[in-house]
Each structure stands twice: as structure tokens, then as C-alpha cells.
Swiss-Prot record:
Known glycosylation sites: N446, N456
Lineage, highest ranks first: Eukaryota, Metazoa, Chordata, Craniata, Vertebrata
Organism: Oryctolagus cuniculus (Rabbit)
Chain positions covered by the region annotation Disordered: 147-169
Name of this protein: Solute carrier family 12 member 1
Tissue: Predominant in kidney. The 3 isoforms are differentially distributed within the kidney: B almost exclusively in cortex, F almost exclusively in medulla, and A about equally distributed.
UniProtKB keywords: Cell membrane, Chloride, Glycoprotein, Ion transport, Membrane, Phosphoprotein, Potassium, Potassium transport, Sodium, Sodium transport, Symport, Transmembrane, Transmembrane helix, Transport
Topology, Cytoplasmic side: 1-177, 223-259, 324-327, 401-417, 631-1099
Molecular-function GO terms, alphabetical: sodium:potassium:chloride symporter activity
Location of the motif RFXV motif: 20-23
A Pfam family per the record: AA_permease
């Protein structure tokens, strides 16, 4: 409610007996403006006694008008000085009270912000983003008070008026039903079927009044629990069309929804045939009585059924409005028929009816019929199985949820009331017919007996009839024998026949509409892509005409087959499977404890819903065990199919919520478990940047973390935080989606930082969750380090130092061509854009050539000129020109091949493990895990260790013993005894030439000059440093010679990473070590664990 200054608004109408604080807004006269600002009265407070329960405190605001406020702003007295502060505040408080939400960039809560894109209930509006209300305003931009916010809060929103008018037009054009016509009527018609008129009397005869009522109540319990679950799900958010399918799919996900939706739609389609055949059989019986058969009973049923289903199709195609009118008419007929039965029970019975077992209400008959009298082959559960389908139909209203004005209110109210009314009617009919009609009667008026003569002691005997011969020979009348008992008892028999017609036709019509609506919703979700054709709707109500035709074809086929006795149990089980899943959906959503599960309908319990699901499954087997098995098998195969296809939908199902809860519980439980070496697994940070830019680095890491460890692809955005955060946030979902699309079970994480090292340091400290915290850093080798800026080298080596500081293992991967293919991706993207533009240009020209009356070629060029279509040309500085000059395909071929080398099967070969230093076993564990993978399983492990020349055999035996205790299979062990000898002169000369540009050579200069150079270039390699680590430098050069000698042909080399002591070895010297160590080799993994055991030989 808005408070306008020009109108007088009083809030005195608010009930005062419940308020302790009341605000009275009283409009003052316009003359108050002329009096000046200082004359504005402050809020007036009226105190009341504490004994006054109606009001404790009243505040009366006396607002002025907008003109007064504008004049006040123009006076310039807006500064909050001591003299004016009170005046300013007392006056403008009123203004801000009236315009809250329109004087701030923040948007006030509106329903439009929470709609989905393309919502049928109204347009979606985007609220101002957090950046828009948080970032600094642009300079030299004048901001008028309140003007910046009118769009955000709905004033002057572009196209808003049009959208609202359009929404109103849509609402005016589409036919929407309330809870009575839309749900109550449909559910009652669907629940009241032919069972009410032709089977309920037989059920009372078999089970008796007592157990008959129990059967009705047990069936009602199943449907009532399902109704409660349906109501809870339907009130947990906006419900669209699709009925049971929509409720199940949005709760349990597309796998369950897609499988049950298809069989539910099919069951409704076949149910049309069942109801139509029931109608046709009744008509054929009437034709028999009048001797008016057309061909024979079977073919007459087919003819009448076909004509009937065509008429029903015509009513459905005419639109939901006509269908609803037909349902109302059928309900009226049905109610008259039921009332006709109850009236007939009090009309005195004649001799003919008495001979057929009807004696009006008799206590003796009630007592006799109260207990069961099951005939041969029948029992409680068999009778229950026959009655239960009569209680179904509770989803008839929910199935047209898209055509309801307010599904959240209509479905709970209409469904539960329909269950109650129909249950009362069933119980009433059962009790009445059981109190009026005996179980067996001959139908012969000659079976009367003289009063007082003892016969068989039955109730009929006491009423003057002897039906004892029915014990020895079959009789035609009575509850057990005559299916037309209700027609006999009723006041006017033909009305019961009309009721049967109404029950069958209304159920058939409801099933026809339900099948088409559910099927259309299923097809719209594109879960089964081949069925997309049936998703199209027509007219203002989006009528599924194609679905109607398909349902008609299915119904016609089963009418012509005329083998419904076989298919009927399966159809009943299909419905029960839907009920079971609806109950399980309600339980599952409650059990998942998702904050999004907050149904407005609170009369439900998750354990009751679970009991209902189990009860539905049990009833399925009670009705027909083989039909239940078939139902489960069909549903299972559809579930597997949908799971395999993985439809691209995200409905926030409870399955997703439970996955989160399960993961959270497991993660929390994991924190209580102490680390143990047997449970160690590599959990890796991988500095891939965008995962698509360094696929080879990700592939090799994923090879030893797949299904056994954690893999996080990390990217650091370096630069101004404002720009970096925007770029980072915009690409995170896309990069995670790339991992999913490429079936890589990994996570993507990104940070924004001022420098690369700070970003990685943040990742090293903060990534992971509890025990699921990465313990290994995987980085690519910096191939072009000699051309890189010094800061990049310092950051690169610093990252390795940081990892060791945090006790995290390090793996450096080197391949000959390098990892980064971002340039290739950029070129590919540019080429794709050019190709799209070229195709668009050709399509436009082709369209223009096809048009007539444009003056031939001249007209074509004129039109192209008007369209301003020109052949795109690349920019001067674009990557296209660069690639063209360097022959892009040939230039990048090796890089592209290298980027996919770890995706391929490696074939027979070796993984050479140079386990030179004991780091806890990570250098050995990673290659062992690789050999377990399908792509690496043909590669054998060859182990190389250092040793003494005079103890090679002993150390080889010791290593073999250790590996066998670790249960690691290996092909060979080599003990290298000459690691510490000096490398050859050529190798050492290459190393010296490589580090020459970075040496300080302070020994050749005087002391002052040397000290000055050290201060100016502290990053250079000093002679003292080089001399101190000369033996280590020899070792790196010598190791490369040994690697060239022994492992040149290996598929992969895993080598102990040398550690550079902080403060002793400069960054450039360390990079020189790594360069000379891995030069001219197959792919190399330099590995260094955190020196904590990752292998054990204890059980």
C-alpha cells in the first residue's frame, strides 16, 4: 500500500485489539507549505496507560506534499547543521517513509526477480547486480535523488506496461479453472467409476460389511497419504503443467520423472480404452435385452467403443472449456444416480424385488452380512485387489495443473475433499446395500414360506423367503451373484444405467486429457529427444493436439485388440508406481533437509509418506505380482536409459539435495578420522590456468587421480582486482562445464591476486575441505624461462618454496612441446567466427537471390548495400595475420599432438622411475598408480636407484625386497653407481654457457664494485654460490647423461625433484638445474613428496 501526499489515508481501520503500536498517517493541508519549513510539526506521540490493552503507543505523522519537499530542496538548506538538523529530519522523514525503495540503488523485493526466464506467469526482471550497487560511480555523473532507482524498483521500467498488459491479455484469453471445476469435479468423477455400481455390492457380499469397510478405508489410506504428499509437493513452489510427471521429476530428478512420466502417460491412454470398453459393454447389454445386436457382442463392443472414443476426442480437441462443461454435466448425472440409489433403499420393496433379495433396511440382514463369506478362490486380498482400482483417480486434477488458476491452492483442497466425499459415498453405499440385500436369492416368488416355519435360519427365512437351494446350485440374484443390485434397489433403474454411462465416459475423458497433458509436459522437457514432436501446443490454452491424436490412436488400438483383461492389472500397477514415487518424493525431499523444501501445505509427515510409498509397492504385488514385476522392469530400463542419456536439465531435485547432504556428512565424518598411511591418495592442485588451455598437464594428473584422489584445476587472475574478479566470475561456470563435458572428474578453482605467487599461495592455504585437502602441487615446467621477466622466474621458484613450506608435495611435468595451447584455441575461435560470418553472408545473398521483383543482379547489390553486408576482413594486429604468416596448420601441429599425447593408449613400453631420494614414497606411488590405468597398463616399471659401485648387487636385492613388501610389481631394478662422477666436458660446457648471462663474476672485480653489483643485481649467480654447490651442479648434469643413456626410449620418466635450499641457491641457478636435468628427454615428472610416508608394508 502506497501513501500518497495528495490523498487522505487513515489506518484507523486496522483492528486495535491486537496492536500495541499504531501509526496514524494524517494528511495536513497544503497551507502548511506556505508556512515554511520551520513550522512543520514533528511526529506527535500520544501515550496511553499500561492498562489500555488496545493501544500502548500511537504516532501520528502529518505529511506534507511533494511540492513542499521540492521547494525545501531548492532553498539550499539541506546541510545538516545544528540549527537545521531537526527541521530537516522531521520534514523529510515523511518523504522517505512514502518513497522507500525508490531513493536507493537497491531493489525492493518483487516477485518478478524470482521468476524463471520465459515464465508463463509474467516477465522476469533482473535486479541490479551486486557490482552495480557496490562499485564506485562514474565521475561527472549527476545523480538526481531517487531517479537512479526507478528502473530497479519498477517505475518507468522499459516495456513494463506492455508486459503487464500482455500478461493480463494472456490471462483473459486462456481458460483457467478453480479448485472446484478443475480438481474436485475431475477427481470425484475419476474415483467414482463403474465399480461403484456393478462391483461394490459383490465386494460387500464376499467380504461382508465390516471387512468391506476395512477394504475401502485401507484403499483410502493409500490414496489419502498420496494426496497429502501430492499436496505438499504441489505447494512447494509454482506448479506447471504435467501433473504427476511434473511433481516427480522436479522432486526426484529427470531419471525418475522421465521413466514414470512415460508409463504414466501410457497408462492413462490405455485407461481410456478400458473405460470406453466398459461403457460399450453396458450398451451392448442393453442391445441384447432389446434384441438389437448389430453383428455380435465382441464386434459391437469394438464399433461402439470406436464411435465413443472419436466423440471424446472431438470434445477434447474443442478445448478445455468444453471438456470441463462436459465433466460438470456428467457429474450431475452421476450424483443423481447415486441419490437415486439411496432413495430406492427406503422405497418399500415389492414381491419381485424381495424374491431377488431386496428387503429394505433390516437389522437381521445387516447382522448376517456384517461378517465375511468368501467363496472358493476368493480372500481378503483378492477382493481388495478388485476394489482398489476404484479408489484411484486422485491425480485427475493434478494432471491438468497447467490449466489451474492457483494449483498450489486447488490441488490440495480439491484432491483431499474429493477423497473424503468419495470415501463417504463408498462406505455409505456399502453399508446400505449390505443392510438391504441378502447374499443369495433365487428370484422366484414361489420360494416364499409361511411365517413361523423353521427353515435354514437365514435372515431371508425370517422375512418369509427360503433361498436355501442357493447353497447347492448357483443362483442369479443377491449380493454374490447379481452385478445389477444397485439398479434393482434404486428408485428408477435407468438412472443407474445413466450413472454407469456417466462414470465410464467421465473417467475416459479425464484419462484422455491427462495422458495428453502429461505427455506434452514430458516431451517439452526433451528427456526423450525422439518425442520432441509432441511437445507443441496450440491455441490460447496450449492444447496438446498432437498428444490427443496419439492418445486416441493408442486407445483405439486397445479397443480393437479387446484384450483388456490382460493389460488391466499392468495399468493399475502403473498408477500405483506413480503413487509410490510421489510418496517417496515427499519423503526424499524432507529427508534431504534442503532449505528449498518448505511446502505451504504443512499437513504431512515424511515417515508417513515413506510408509505410503512402501504400502503402494505392497499393494502392487497384492493386486498382481507378475504385473508388479513387469512394471518394475519397465521402469528400471527407462531409468537406465534416461541416466545414460543425461538430459541437460537442472530442476534442483531432492536427489541433488541429498547428494549434498551425503557429501557434507561424509566430509564431516572424515574429519574425525585420523590420517593413516594406508589411506593416502594423491590430492592435487594443478596449475592449468583454464583447464582447456593446458590439456596435457590435466590429462597426466587426472591419470593418477581418477577415482582415487582429488584433482583441482587452479587458475590465478593477475591484475587490477576489479577487472580480474569480473573476468574470473564470468568464466567459472564455463570452465567447470568444460570439465564435465570432457568427462574429467575434477574441480575448477580460481583466485584473483596482485601477483601470481600470491594467488597460488592463497590456493595452497585455503583450497580443500577438511581431510579432502590437496597434498600435492602439480605444475608445468616453465619452458621459456630464459626469455621470461625476472619476476616470473622468482614467482615460479617461489611457488615451489611455498609448497614445501606448507608441507605439500611438488610434481613438475615437462614435455618437449610445452603445455600452453591458448594461442591455438584463440586462432581456432577466430577462424570459427570468420566461418560463421562467411556462412551468414552466403545465406543472406542466397535469400536475396530467391526473392522476386528486386531487379535481378542490380536489385541484389542494392539490397546487399542497404543491408551493409561486407566480407569480414581480419584486423591488422589479429592473430589471423600472425598465423597466416607462420603457416598456422604446420606451425601448431606438433603442439596440438603433444597436447593430446596422454589421452592416447600408451602401448607397450616402460615407465622409468629414478627414485634417487626418499621423499616418503610419492615418487614411487604415482607411477604405480599410472600402471593401474587402462591407457598405461601395458607399461612396465623400471626402477633406478643410486648406490655404491662395490655394493650394487646388495643394494639391488635390498630394493627388490622393499618393493615386494610394498607389493609393487616391477620389471627390473637398476642400481647406478657412477652418479657422482663428473659429467663430460661437453655437457658441463653447455651448462656453463646456459648460466653465463646470469653470473655476477664478482671475483674478477674489486671488492667495492663487487658489493655494488650484488646490491644492484641480487638475483644473479655469484661465484661463491656456484662454487658452494658445484658438486650438486655436477650431479644434475651427470644425471641428464645417465637419463639419456638409460631412459631415452621410455614412455615416461619419473625423477626425484632436486630441492633448492632457501637462501643458498638462487632462482636462476635452480631453473638451470631443472633445465639441464630434463633436457632432450621423453615426458618427465619431477616428483618430491613432503617426506611423510605414503607407502607402508604393514597390514
Amino acid at each position: 500500500m502506497s501513501l500518497n501526499n495528495s490523498s487522505s489515508v487513515f489506518l484507523d481501520s486496522v483492528p486495535t485489539n491486537t496492536n500495541r503500536f499504531q501509526v496514524n498517517v494524517i494528511n495536513e493541508n497544503h497551507e502548511s507549505c506556505a508556512a515554511g519549513i520551520d513550522n512543520t510539526d514533528p511526529p506527535h506521540y500520544e501515550e496511553t496507560s499500561f492498562g489500555d490493552e488496545q493501544n500502548r503507543l500511537r504516532i501520528s505523522f502529518r505529511p506534507g506534499n511533494q511540492e513542499c519537499y521540492d521547494n525545501f530542496l531548492q532553498t539550499g538548506e539541506t546541510t545538516k547543521t545544528d540549527a537545521s538538523f531537526h527541521t530537516y529530519d522531521s520534514h523529510t522523514n515523511t518523504y522517505y517513509l512514502q518513497t522507500f525503495g525508490h531513493n536507493t540503488m537497491d531493489a525492493v523485493p518483487k516477485i518478478e526477480y524470482y521468476r524463471n526466464t520465459g515464465s508463463v506467469s509474467g516477465p522476469k526482471v533482473n535486479r541490479p547486480s551486486l557490482l552495480e550497487i557496490h562499485e564506485q560511480l562514474a565521475k561527472n555523473v549527476a545523480v538526481t535523488p531517487g531517479s537512479a532507482d526507478r528502473v530497479a524498483n519498477g517505475e518507468g521500467m522499459p516495456g513494463e506496461e506492455h508486459a503487464e498488459n500482455k500478461e493480463e491479455d494472456n490471462k483473459a484469453g486462456a481458460v483457467k479453472f478453480g479448485w472446484v471445476k478443475g480438481v474436485l469435479v475431475r477427481c470425484m468423477l475419476n474415483i467414482w467409476g463403474v465399480m461403484l455400481f456393478i462391483r461394490l455390492s459383490w465386494i460387500v457380499g464376499e467380504a461382508g460389511i465390516g471387512l468391506g469397510v476395512v477394504i475401502i478405508l485401507l484403499s483410502t489410506m493409500v490414496t489419502s497419504i498420496t494426496g497429502l504428499s501430492t499436496s505438499a509437493i504441489a505447494t512447494n513452489g509454482f506448479v506447471r503443467g504435467g501433473g504427476a510427471y511434473y511433481l516427480i521429476s522436479r522432486s526426484l530428478g529427470p531419471e525418475f520423472g522421465g521413466s514414470i512420466g512415460l508409463i504414466f502417460a501410457f497408462a492413462n491412454a490405455v485407461a481410456v480404452a478400458m473405460y470406453v470398453v466398459g461403457f460399450a459393454e453396458t450398451v451392448v447389454d442393453l442391445l441384447k435385452e432389446s434384441d438389437s445386436m448389430m453383428v455380435d457382442p465382441t464386434n459391437d463392443i469394438r464399433i461402439i467403443g470406436s464411435i465413443t472414443v472419436v466423440i471424446l476426442l472431438g470434445i477434447s480437441v474443442a478445448g478445455m472449456e468444453w471438456e470441463a462443461k462436459a465433466q460438470v454435466i456428467l457429474l450431475i448425472i452421476l450424483l443423481i444416480a447415486i441419490a437415486n440409489f439411496f432413495i430406492g433403499t427406503v422405497i418399500p420393496s415389492n414381491n419381485e424385488k424381495k424374491s431377488r433379495g431386496f428387503f429394505n433396511y433390516q437389522a437381521s440382514i445387516f447382522a448376517e452380512n456384517f461378517g465375511p463369506s468368501f467363496t472358493k478362490g476368493e480372500g481378503f486380498f483378492s477382493v481388495f485387489a478388485i476394489f482398489f482400482p476404484a479408489a484411484t483417480g486422485i491425480l485427475a486434477g493434478a494432471n491438468i495443473s497447467g490449466d489451474l488458476e492457483d494449483p498450489q491452492d486447488a490441488i490440495p483442497r480439491g484432491t483431499m475433499l474429493a477423497i473424503f466425499i468419495t470415501t463417504v459415498a463408498y462406505i455409505g453405499v456399502a453399508i446400505c446395500v449390505g443392510a438391504c440385500v441378502v447374499r443369495d436369492a433365487t428370484g422366484s416368488m414361489n420360494d416364499t414360506i409361511i411365517s413361523g416355519i423353521n427353515c435354514n435360519g437365514s435372515a431371508a427365512c425370517g422375512l418369509g423367503y427360503d433361498f436355501s437351494r442357493c447353497r447347492h446350485e448357483p443362483c442369479q440374484y443377491g449380493l454374490m451373484n447379481n452385478f445389477q443390485v444397485m439398479s434393482m434397489v434404486s428408485g428408477f433403474g435407468p438412472l443407474i444405467t445413466a450413472g454407469i454411462f456417466s462414470a465410464t465416459l467421465s473417467s475416459a475423458l479425464a484419462s484422455l486429457v491427462s495422458a495428453a497433458k502429461v505427455f506434452q509436459a514430458l516431451c517439452k522437457d526433451n528427456i526423450y529427444k525422439a518425442l520432441q514432436f509432441f511437445a507443441k501446443g496450440y491455441g490460447k490454452n496450449n492444447e496438446p493436439l498432437r498428444g490427443y491424436i496419439l492418445t486416441f490412436v493408442i486407445a483405439m488400438a486397445f479397443i480393437l485388440i479387446a484384450e483388456l483383461n490382460t493389460i488391466a492389472p499392468i495399468i493399475s500397477n502403473f498408477f500405483l508406481a506413480s503413487y509410490a514415487l510421489i510418496n517417496f518424493s515427499c519423503f526424499h525431499a524432507s529427508y534431504a533437509k534442503s532449505p528449498g523444501w518448505r511446502p505451504a501445505y504443512g499437513i504431512y509427515n515424511m515417515w508417513v509418506s515413506l510408509f505410503g510409498a512402501v504400502l503402494c509397492c505392497a499393494v502392487m504385488f497384492v493386486i498382481n505380482w507378475w504385473a508388479a514385476v513387469i512394471t518394475y522392469v519397465i521402469e528400471f530400463f527407462l531409468y537406465i536409459y534416461v541416466t545414460y542419456k543425461k538430459p541437460d536439465v537442472n530442476w534442483g531435485s531432492s536427489t541433488q539435495a541429498l547428494s549434498y547432504v551425503s557429501a557434507l556428512d561424509n566430509a564431516l565424518e572424515l574429519t574425525t578420522v585420523e590420517d593413516h598411511v594406508k589411506n593416502f591418495r594423491p590430492q592435487c592442485f594443478v596449475l592449468t590456468g583454464g583447464p582447456m588451455t593446458r590439456p596435457a598437464l590435466l590429462d597426466i594428473t587426472y591419470a593418477f587421480t581418477k577415482n582415487s584422489g582429488l584433482c583441482i584445476c587452479c587458475e590465478v587472475f593477475v591484475g587490477p582486482r576489479k577487472l580480474c574478479v569480473k573476468e574470473m566470475n564470468s568464466g567459472m561456470a564455463k570452465k567447470q562445464a568444460w570439465l564435465i563435458k570432457n568427462k574429467i572428474k575434477a574441480f575448477y578453482a580460481a583466485v584473483a591476486a596482485d601477483c601470481f605467487r600470491d594467488g597460488v599461495r592463497s590456493l595452497l592455504q585455503a583450497s580443500g575441505l577438511g581431510r579432502m585437502k590437496p597434498n600435492t602441487l602439480v605444475i608445468g615446467y616453465k619452458k621459456k624461462w630464459r626469455k621470461a621477466p625476472l619476476t616470473e622466474i622468482e614467482n615460479y621458484v617461489g611457488i615451489i618454496h611455498d609448497a614445501f613450506d606448507f608441507e605439500i608435495g611438488v610434481v613438475i611435468v615437462r614435455i618437449s612441446q610445452g603445455f600452453d595451447i591458448s594461442q591455438v584455441l584463440q586462432v581456432q575461435e577466430e577462424l570459427e567466427k570468420l566461418e560463421q560470418e562467411r556462412l551468414a553472408l552466403e545465406a543472406t545473398i542466397k535469400d536475396n537471390e530467391c526473392e522476386e521483383g528486386n531487379g535481378g543482379i542490380r536489385g541484389l547489390f542494392k539490397k546487399v548495400g542497404k543491408l551493409n553486408i561486407t566480407k569480414p576482413t581480419p584486423k591488422k594486429d589479429s592473430s589471423i595475420n600472425t598465423i597466416q604468416s607462420m603457416h598456422v596448420g604446420e606451425f601448431n601441429q606438433k603442439l596440438v599432438e603433444a597436447s593430446t599425447q596422454f589421452k592416447k593408449k600408451q602401448g607397450k613400453g616402460t615407465i622409468d622411475v629414478w627414485w634417487l631420494f626418499d621423499d616418503g614414497g610419492l615418487t614411487l606411488l604415482i607411477p604405480y598408480i599410472l600402471t593401474l590405468r587402462k591407457k598405461w597398463k601395458d607399461c612396465k616399471l623400471r626402477i633406478y636407484v643410486g648406490g655404491k659401485i662395490n655394493r650394487i648387487e646388495e643394494e639391488k636385492i635390498a630394493m627388490a625386497s622393499l618393493l615386494s613388501k610394498f607389493r609393487i610389481k616391477f620389471a627390473d631394478i637398476h642400481v647406478i653407481g657412477d652418479i657422482n662422477i663428473k659429467p663430460n666436458k661437453e655437457s658441463w660446457k653447455f651448462f656453463e654457457e646456459m648460466i653465463e648471462p646470469y653470473r655476477l663474476h664478482e671475483s674478477c672485480k674489486d671488492l667495492t664494485t663487487a658489493e655494488k653489483l650484488k646490491r644492484e643485481t641480487p638475483w644473479k649467480i655469484t661465484d661463491a654460490e656456484l662454487e658452494a654447490v658445484k658438486e650438486k651442479s655436477y650431479r644434475q648434469v651427470r644425471l641428464n647423461e645417465l637419463l639419456q643413456e638409460h631412459s631415452r626410449a621410455a614412455n615416461l620418466i619419473v625423477l626425484s625433484l632436486p630441492v633448492a635450499r632457501k637462501g643458498s641457491i638462487s632462482d636462476l641457478l635452480y631453473m638451470a638445474w631443472l633445465e639441464i636435468l630434463t633436457k632432450n628427454l621423453p615426458p618427465v615428472l619431477l616428483v618430491r613428496g613432503n617426506h611423510k610416508n605414503v607407502l607402508t608394508f604393514y597390514s
